[in-house]
Design a protein with these regions (language model features):
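Acidic/His-leaning functional-site neighborhoods
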Residues: 127-131, 186, 196
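Single conserved hydrophobic/aromatic residue that forms the stacking wall/gate
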Residues: 2-18
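Double-stranded beta-helix
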Residues: 58, 62-177, 181
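A short, structural micro-pattern
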Residues: 21, 93-95, 189-191
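Short beta-strand His + acidic residue motifs that chelate non-heme Fe in jelly-roll/DSBH
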Residues: 182-188
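A short hydrophobic beta-strand segment most commonly corresponding to one strand
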Residues: 117, 190-199
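Extended, Lys/Arg-enriched charged tracts that mediate electrostatic binding to polyanionic substrates
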Residues: 14, 23-83
Length: 199
């Protein structure tokens, strides 16, 4: 069950007030040996929208204009204006960062979170879909209403950078930019249950 509290602001007279907000996406609980709860490498917050939505086009303008070195992924100017296709599997809450908090001890090979810790990798993902070897209507496997797929067929070089997060203890947390590619290990090879919460 997802719980969301809307980010809200109000104007009272001439003063701006901002209300506290929080967002809990889901809890992940895996038992030793589980091989059913892995997630393939992806980015949340839309897939095909990144090429066709006017706000995403503004966000990625430097990438599409072949000035990818100038792309600033931390400029959030248009990120709260993107429009995603409706889907029960995709969160529609604007998040400046995504997070994972350990509720139990966990680490590599425990079926835990993986990242490609390169924020500007989005430049590779977006432009890769525009190369001649990719069918015009395919966008490297991106599908409406799904997360942005990062796969072996088109992104094998990028996937070499996929690493598991380090050993974490209850209360430890890790945060990543919404353009960072992430996954969950296919199998839990550890000996204890692990529980983590996405925030």
């Amino acid at each position: 069950q997802k719980t969301a509290y809307a980010i809200s602001a109000c104007l009272v007279g001439s003063e701006m007030c901002i209300r506290d907000s929080s967002y809990a996406d889901r809890i992940r609980r895996r038992e030793p040996g589980d091989d059913s709860l892995g997630l393939s490498p992806h980015c949340d917050a839309g897939s095909v929208e990144r090429w066709i939505d006017p706000s995403y086009q503004k966000i990625y303008n430097d990438i599409f204009a072949d000035r990818f070195k100038n792309f600033n992924p931390f400029d959030a100017k248009f990120r709260d204006r993107t429009i995603e296709f409706e889907s029960p599997a995709v969160a529609h809450v604007f998040r400046t960062f995504q997070g994972w908090t350990a509720l139990t001890e966990q680490g590599p090979k425990d079926g835990t979170l993986q990242l490609i810790p390169i924020t500007k990798a989005m430049a590779y993902v977006l432009t890769r879909a525009l190369l001649e070897d990719v069918p015009e209507n395919e966008l490297c496997g991106s599908k409406v209403g799904k997360a942005l797929s990062v796969n072996e067929t088109y992104h094998s070089l990028l996937l070499e950078g996929l690493i598991s997060i380090p050993k974490m203890y209850p209360g430890d947390t890790i945060w990543w930019h919404p353009d960072v590619i992430h996954a969950v290990e296919d199998k839990h090879l550890g000996i204890f249950f692990f529980i983590g919460i996405y925030v």
